[in-house]
Amino acid sequence: MKKLFLFFVLVCAVVLSAGEKLPRYIILFIGDGMSTPQRMMAEEFARKTGRGELIINHFPFHASTRTVSTSSLVTDSAAAGTAIACGTKTANGRIGVTPDGKIRFESVAELAKKKNYKVGIVTTMTINHATPASFYGHRISRSQYYELGVDLVNSDFDYFAGGGVAFPTGKPAKKGAPAPKLPNIYDLAAKKGYKVLKDKKAFMALKPGSGKILYSGAPGRISAAIDAGKEDITLAELTAKGLELLKNEKGFFLMVEGGTIDSYGHGNEAASNLREVLALDDAVKEAVKFMKKHPQDTLIVVTGDHETGGMTMGFAGSGYAMYMDRLAHQKVSISKFGSLLKDARKAKKDFSYADVQKMVTRYFGLQFTGDPKKEPMALSAEQKKALEAAFQKNRLPGTLKLIMNQKAGIGWTTGAHTALPVLTTATGAQAKRFSGFIDNTDIANILKSLLK
């Protein structure tokens, strides 16, 4: 099936190059914190574990993409999101405005709406987070969550889906302070004609003609890919439903963000990070299915806003060896394991290091017996000593994360962003325009030029 997908993508590229027309359906995917290292880590993991190649890495057109903001070589998501959405640079922290906040930029989504296209915004994070907000918001600070929520409501876009709206009644003045009681964003949305949904079953039952949608799949963000159960909504499902609801004769613009890639980049957590990239790839597959039905009318672009974590494939401790398949042994995110560990301590008064060893083996595949030179997941004497010390100091999750990175051969240089260029790939109508070396502002400006 994977080979058929890739074959179809390449055939589309050949057919369209002969006489392309402007696309009616424009689908932009953004991996927050996703640069080439994250793409390739996920690719190698997928190959080693039998999943196959990532479709995002095998689109026919590629462009190395510069991400610098006006205030720093190292951008944040607000400035990068604004550049990708609006085609103009700004300073870190700004959303859809100049560095001084005096001039508003028009995003490709807003222009599409003005030209009577339907518009959708999807993310794994809160819908008023920096990247998605860059397509409809205009604020001096990305932290103005409530005000960005108001911008969301006033955008009149057709489809919003993700982790809900952060601080729907206002952000507390300081940590621990009570939240303000401003008019609830969800109530404002309903008054503006949005159908506000929080139930997955009701959401999945939506059909074309349902009207404007604001769907909150979970409070804060949808479940991490590594932790998600069958009952949890996925980015692929949010994307597929968006494609279904937005389709019309005029066309649509849909932006889909894999926002949680960034979260696990900041945390330097390889296993969870790569699974978010795979989740984004699954969402892109839904777009490719759609393109198969509308091959000459669809453009799919996949990019990142910046790199997060300074991730490297290979580090001093592993030399020239890498073992990406070892990350398959990790069954939960580090934060989820922390919660499980806390619950286990509460449930058993005499909870001991022997108890935690069983949990470590169950959720990470690490073995406390055996020779690490012969058994890949066996712990060395130093690693066992580090884990026991971490258990005594209540720092076990962080030490487990470090050991799993070491086992795979993954290194990290920072808990913040880096200035690495990102990779942009594209397929479909006019995809050839995303080639060579470009700036992130070029993405919006190219897409704007394709709107009729």
List PLM regions with ranges.
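Positively charged n-region of N-terminal signal peptides that target proteins for export
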Residues: M1-L4
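Hydrophobic h-region of N-terminal signal peptides that target proteins for export
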Residues: V9-S17
